[in-house]
Amino acid sequence: MKSARRRSRELATQGLYQWLLSGSPGGEIDAQLRGAQGFDKADHEHLDAVLHGVIRDSEALSAAIAPCLDRPIEQLSPVERAVLLVAAFELKNHLDIPYRVVINEAVELAKTFGGADGYKYVNGVLDKLSAQLREDETQAARKR
């Protein structure tokens, strides 16, 4: 059974995918997500924070992700880009969520919504990004 937090990440990823493709306002996407299957079982507070936070901070998040990529962020598939934005937002703003959990959840999102090997790429990018954004936490984990 999926956790409420996982459902909120799935819905945020779907909403951000739509936002990346259509450029629709966040409020419009939010309204559509409220009618989506699984919304009633999602962590609404986390969904709102992630969806609106990523849209608000998308330039800064993309700038943080860019050095970890092997190509311009615009060349990523919209699914990979949405997943990376969700994870980057959580890494930067939700320090209560361990970085390994953020990476694992992003890998699961990439497996669910992305191409065959997209999850491997997401994992590699987030490994680099977490080392930058959560240097102390990642170094402590690697010393164990």
Curated annotation (Swiss-Prot):
Cross-referenced SUPFAM superfamilies: NusB-like (SSF48013)
Annotated GO biological process: DNA-templated transcription termination; transcription antitermination
Keyword line: RNA-binding, Transcription, Transcription antitermination, Transcription regulation
GO MF: RNA binding
UniProt keyword annotation of NAD present: no
GO CC annotations, alphabetized: cytosol
Pfam family, one: NusB
Stated role: Involved in transcription antitermination. Required for transcription of ribosomal RNA (rRNA) genes. Binds specifically to the boxA antiterminator sequence of the ribosomal RNA (rrn) operons.
Name of this protein: Transcription antitermination protein NusB
Protein source organism: Paraburkholderia xenovorans (strain LB400)
Gene: nusB
